[in-house]
């Protein structure tokens, strides 16, 4: 058997033979690939994704290694610069849910990415973590260059505001799975916290105060019920302005999920580290999210009259004849984040952060109680 190594034609030889600069193999110009005929246009996908790098690069810092397009995003955290001695990584993954339907209907896609990033940022912030990096997932029947650019722009803007690097993602074409003009959007975030600063609910005790931070609307939860009531039962249009709402239905439903990261940065800088725990009020509302941070032997008692509930929730509750307690289990009802702090510091912290003391922690069995019972 011959052991002589066979040489492959060099680029120089190839160019000399053909008189042309060699290029990557591709389907003949003017013809359509079999894959494209099946609904997946690889060439279109490559063209669409070619401009992503310029959009996400502003989110990168010295800790990001390499660029976009590799098999994996590379991130080397500088623990020393961050002042972290015993690092704990915190990860979360989420989607935007049926709020996407509003983006489709209004053809407005530049805020939905911020919804996703802010939701994920808040989810890890309640553990005491600060964001490191983010990855996104976008899937559609067919990629629309304009829509994709708007989505990525929103993602990048929110990541930059959160000091979080957008280091990669997946963009998939799935014909037959999604409707024309529709897509799905999800993302994963990883953050970091020093173990001594980890918030896990263990510091919560009877006598603590509950400080509620205001939401600006539905955020990213309860849209299936909201759409059912507003559009099917009440017959409203996106351009309608119901009494008391102050804006159109479409504008109200597209309000960007608020990021509470600036508030957490302020809290971490306070003397004495007053934050005992925090709960992001998302799907499940106050009723299901507060128990996630309550230790055994503690209940959360909420006064639903201690803050002003935004008009949109009243419109949905009355319009759909929804049980008042169910409203507090589906929607945030105007409270997007709850902080657990020492009772004697509750009012001061609430005033400093623009929130309200909405209740307190008492002895109990790990549930949420309302006093008085909420009503529409």
Regions found by a protein language model. Name each.
Residues 40, 44, 112, 221, ...:
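A generic structural signal for residues located within well-ordered alpha-helices
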Residues 48, 52, 74, 120-121, ...:
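Buried hydrophobic packing segments
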Residues 93, 184, 197-250, 287:
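Short, acidic (Asp/Glu-rich) active-site segment that either coordinates a divalent metal cofactor
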Residues 43, 54-216:
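Glycine-rich phosphate/pyrophosphate-binding loop regions near the starts of catalytic domains
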């Amino acid at each position: 058997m011959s052991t002589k190594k066979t040489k492959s034609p060099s680029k120089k030889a190839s160019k000399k033979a053909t008189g042309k600069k060699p290029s990557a193999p591709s389907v003949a110009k003017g013809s359509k690939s079999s894959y494209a005929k099946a609904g997946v246009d690889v060439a279109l996908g490559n063209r669409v994704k070619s401009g992503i790098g310029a959009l996400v690069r502003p989110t990168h810092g010295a800790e990001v290694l390499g660029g976009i397009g590799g098999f994996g995003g590379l991130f080397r955290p500088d623990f020393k610069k961050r002042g972290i001695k015993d690092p704990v990584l915190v990860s979360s993954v989420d989607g935007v849910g049926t709020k996407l339907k509003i983006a489709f209907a209004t053809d407005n896609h530049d805020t939905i990415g911020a919804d996703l990033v802010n939701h994920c940022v808040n989810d890890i912030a309640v553990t005491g973590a600060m964001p490191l990096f983010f990855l996104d997932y976008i899937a559609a029947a067919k990629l629309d260059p304009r829509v994709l650019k708007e989505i990525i722009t929103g993602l990048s803007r929110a990541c930059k505001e959160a000091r979080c690097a957008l280091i990669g993602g997946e963009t998939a074409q799935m014909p037959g799975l999604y409707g024309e003009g529709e897509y799905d959007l999800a993302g994963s975030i990883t953050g970091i916290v020093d173990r001594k600063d980890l918030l896990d609910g263990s510091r919560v005790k009877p006598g603590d105060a509950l400080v509620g931070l205001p939401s600006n609307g539905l955020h990213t939860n309860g849209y299936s019920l909201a759409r059912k009531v507003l559009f099917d039962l009440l017959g409203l249009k996106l351009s309608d302005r119901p009494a008391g709402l102050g804006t159109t239905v479409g504008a109200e439903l597209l309000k960007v999920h608020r990021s509470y990261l600036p508030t957490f940065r302020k809290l971490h800088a306070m003397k004495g580290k007053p934050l005992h725990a925090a709960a992001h009020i998302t799907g499940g509302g106050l009723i299901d999210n507060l128990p996630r941070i309550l230790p055994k032997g503690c209940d959360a008692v909420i006064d639903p009259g201690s803050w002003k509930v935004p008009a949109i929730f009243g419109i949905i509750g009355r319009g759909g004849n929804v049980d008042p307690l169910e409203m507090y289990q589906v929607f945030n009802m105007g409270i997007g984040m709850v902080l657990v702090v020492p009772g004697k510091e509750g009012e001061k912290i609430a005033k400093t952060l623009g929130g309200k003391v909405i209740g307190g922690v008492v002895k109990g069995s790990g549930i949420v109680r309302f006093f008085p019972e909420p009503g529409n």
